[in-house]
Every structure is written in C-alpha cells, then in structure tokens.
C-alpha cells in the first residue's frame, strides 16, 4: 500500500443527462484544481486501479446526497463523469490521464439497497484489497477480495442493452422485492485509459463467499454442442454443460418445499425475460460437497497479490473516504464475523442468497448455488440469421440454442425442471 501526495491535477467533473442514442449530452461541467492527500491503491493493472479509484470517488459523491424519494425517468438516462489529467502522477499508482464514468448512479444505488447491500460495504468489498482474476467464458472476470462481488468486463453493446432494459429490470426488482434468480446488477461503469474504453458490470457473486464450489454446470436446455471441451475438462474447476450433466447422471437433491419455491421463482423470472425478448441465458449451478469441504486442505502458496498487500491497503477517492468505512469495515462478507462460527456446509442466507442445502436423507450432502446468468442477449436480426443457419445444419427438430425467446424459455424450463431428483 502506498500513501502518496498527489500533485496539482486538472480534474474535470461532469454530470450528464440524456442525449441522442447511447451518447449523453453534458448539462453541467466544471474544471478546478485540487491539492489532496490520497491513499492510492498500488494496482499492477492501470485499468483495475482506475476502476477502483472511480468506484471510491463515486460512492463518496453519492454519500453527500440523500437518496431520492423516488426515481425519475431522467435517472435512467443520467451518468456521472470525472476526467483526470496529471502529467506528474506516478505511473505505479495510477495512469497520468484517465476518465471514469458511472451510468445511472441513483438507479444502481437504489438497486444495491433493494438487494440489501450498503454502499460502504460495497465500497470496502471492492477496494480494500485487490480483486483476483477468475476464469470466465468470455471477457475479463474479476472477483473481489471477500468473494461477495464479481466484476465482469463487457462490450459496449452489452452496456447499451443493459441500459435500454434497466428501467424494466428495476421495476421487476421492485415488484419481486429483490427475490429473484436474475443477476443482481449493482453498478455499471466505463473506464478510459490510454484512449481505450473498457466497460464494467458489478454483480453479486452467484456462488458462496466461503464455501468452495467443487463442480459447476452451465445449463441452457439445448444439447447441441453443449458438452465441455477436452481442454475445459482438464481445468481444476471446469464449467460443464448440459450433456455432461446427463452423462454423469447428476441430480440436484433438495426438499420438495425448496424445489417448489425455486421453480416458481424461476418461472416468474423466465416470463420476465420472454417479455424483453431475451434468450441464450443459462442456469449456473454450483455444487459444494460438504464432506469434501470439511476435510482439511493443504496450505497452498501465498498469492502474489496477497503477499504484496498489508491489512490497511485501501483505495480511496477524496480525503473524506480515508478510514471512513461505516460500521462494518469488513465489507459485505464482514457480517459473518459478528455471528456464531459456521460449521461444515452452513451459510448465512442473506449473504449467500442463492444457496440451498440438500434435503435430509439425500445420497449426497451438498449445498447448491443456482442462479440465472447471461441475460443480455436479445432476439435480434443476428439471432434470427443464426437460427436459420443452425436449422439448415442440424435440422428443424434439433435442440439448437438459437430459437425464438418463447421456444427457448419452454425448452429451458422443461430441462431445469428435470434436474431435480
């Protein structure tokens, strides 16, 4: 961790509102010089460093303003921006020039609240220690130090799709009181370093922050080309698919009440996705083996990023943030330390919101983590063309993934209903 005095920097801050298309027209813009003492995160990756700095700056800005009584249409078109130009800023801390943009800050603030996540906990979980790289199917995938949040690098098209559906998503979360299998979207950002834009989505981790997953499946319902590759299968924790699930005779052993609640929630969520003409989503299934998880593990080597960080390492924005982390300085997962110690296979349902324990008498003592992922693909001209091409290749009756949203939903629900014992 480094504490450095930041030399005078030109900082341009802007609050923006709606504009044509996906762009935004600036409503207000001010430029001023600041001299400030800032604790700066020593991130090896400039992109990550700027992202974490920007989140800290954003949360600090939001903390100065009370939440609105109700969200207005303009809140779904708004954004906040900051531009930093500082030729003297040391490269090992942050780049000398960068821009940071948060989309719809009040909307995501409201969503975090509805998902039971305090802004200060959100900040600490993201920034107290460096996030670690995790294996993702496409794009960059980071997981925060307490494993409660994931940061996914997405395309500008994904951001545009997310932006266009955000109002519907928010209304749905309000209607279901946050009780959903959909991804819990908590923040949407753009980071500009070296004249390159990167887009980040922050979500709650579908898996546990403390119970390791021993097997995982990405289930769509389609069986064509839905088997993990040989290259994937040799990984320590491969992402298996529908054919693998069937070939291994895998089943999910939960009680009838839990199964009923889960399927009702799933059907409601899928109906919502059909209304938005969304398809190609999956059920992510993670399985924690309680017996295996209770066995002592050999200590592995200390990760390089852990060995380089002391306990007080934090990235903060303006000085008001330094050392002011509210009443739960351990972040989202920190609540766990104020309660009784958890035994093998035990979890706190308000943190591990997607966890379901196997039923009494089940052949395997397991904890299952199940939620919907990849919900940004809409049925557009590209999907129609892909559907036509695959129909020619595999035949009209083949279980291909690119079908109409209604067909996709029916096939998906039929498949998921049958994964239970």
Swiss-Prot record:
Enzyme class, first EC level, given as a word: transferase
GO-annotated molecular function: 1-phosphatidylinositol-4-phosphate 5-kinase activity; 1-phosphatidylinositol-5-phosphate 4-kinase activity; ATP binding
Keywords: Acetylation, ATP-binding, Cytoplasm, Endoplasmic reticulum, Kinase, Lipid metabolism, Nucleotide-binding, Phosphoprotein, Transferase
Positions of the UniProt region annotated as Required for interaction with PIP5K1A: 69-75
Record SMART domains: PIPKc
Gene Ontology BP terms: 1-phosphatidyl-1D-myo-inositol 4,5-bisphosphate biosynthetic process; negative regulation of insulin receptor signaling pathway
Compartments, as annotated in UniProt: Endoplasmic reticulum; Cytoplasm
Superkingdom of origin organism: Eukaryota
PROSITE patterns found in the cross-reference section: PIPK
Quaternary state and interactors: Interacts with PIP5K1A; the interaction inhibits PIP5K1A kinase activity.
Protein name: Phosphatidylinositol 5-phosphate 4-kinase type-2 gamma
Organism of this sequence: Pongo abelii (Sumatran orangutan)
Gene that encodes it: PIP4K2C
């Amino acid at each position: 961790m480094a504490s450095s005095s930041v030399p005078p920097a030109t900082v341009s801050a802007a609050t923006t509102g709606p504009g044509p298309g996906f762009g935004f027209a600036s409503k207000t813009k001010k430029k001023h010089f600041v001299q400030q003492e800032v604790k700066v995160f020593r991130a090896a990756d400039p992109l990550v460093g700027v992202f974490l700095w920007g989140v800290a700056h954003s949360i600090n800005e939001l903390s100065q303003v009370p939440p609105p009584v109700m969200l207005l249409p303009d809140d779904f078109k708004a954004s906040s921006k900051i531009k930093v130009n500082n030729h003297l800023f040391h490269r090992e801390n942050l780049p000398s020039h960068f821009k940071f943009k948060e989309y719809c800050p009040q909307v995501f603030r409201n969503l975090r609240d509805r998902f039971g996540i305090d802004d200060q906990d959100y900040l600490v979980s993201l920034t107290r220690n460096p996030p670690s790289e995790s294996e993702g199917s496409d794009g960059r995938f980071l997981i925060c130090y307490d494993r409660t949040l994931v940061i996914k690098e997405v395309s500008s098209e994904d951001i545009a799709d997310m932006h266009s559906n955000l109002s519907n998503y928010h209304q749905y979360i309000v209607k279901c009181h946050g009780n959903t299998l959909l991804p819990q979207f908590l923040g949407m950002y753009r980071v500009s370093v070296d004249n390159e834009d990167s887009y980040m989505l922050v979500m709650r981790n579908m898996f546990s922050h403390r119970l390791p997953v021993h097997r995982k499946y990405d289930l769509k319902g389609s069986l064509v080309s839905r088997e993990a590759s040989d290259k994937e299968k040799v990984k320590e924790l491969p992402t298996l698919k529908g054919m693998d699930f069937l070939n291994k005779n895998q089943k999910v052993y939960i009680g009838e009440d839990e199964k009923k609640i889960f399927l009702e929630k799933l059907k409601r969520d899928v109906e919502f996705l059909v209304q938005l003409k969304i398809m190609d989503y999956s059920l992510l299934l993670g399985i924690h083996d309680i017996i295996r998880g209770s066995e002592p593990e050999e200590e592995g080597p200390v990760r390089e990023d852990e060995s380089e960080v002391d306990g007080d390492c934090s990235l903060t924005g303006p000085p008001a943030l330094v050392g002011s982390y509210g009443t739960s300085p351990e972040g989202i997962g920190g609540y766990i330390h104020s309660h009784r110690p958890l035994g093998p296979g035990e979890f706190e349902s308000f943190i591990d919101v997607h966890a379901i324990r196997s039923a009494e008498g089940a052949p395997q003592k397991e904890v299952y983590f199940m939620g919907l992922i990849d919900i940004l693909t809409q049925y557009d001209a590209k999907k129609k063309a892909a559907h036509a091409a695959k129909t020619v290749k595999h035949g009209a009756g083949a279980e291909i993934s690119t079908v109409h949203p209604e067909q996709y939903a029916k096939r998906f629900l039929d498949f998921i209903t049958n994964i239970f014992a």
